[in-house]
Amino acid sequence: MILAWIIKYTDSARKQLKKLDKQSAVRILDFMDERISEETNPRASGKILKGPKLGLYWRYRIGSHRIICDIQDGQLCVLVIKIEN
């Protein structure tokens, strides 16, 4: 049995998502819910952020948008922190 990863959004990420056009928002939500949550290793589809304070965060590219996430292995949770264009 494969456990699905839980996708959660910070309040600021939700606000950023609401500011996007509907098509972009749906594309991001679909990507996170259908692709990332079903992966055995969500890191396989992303890139680690590099820098002294950024080593714990991962980035996904969806079209022209960048999704910044914290992958929490102990809870099988991908926390979306920021959505940038």
Question: Where do the model's predicted regions map?
Answer:
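Enriched for short, Lys/Arg-rich terminal
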Residues: 1-6, 11, 15-19, 26, ...
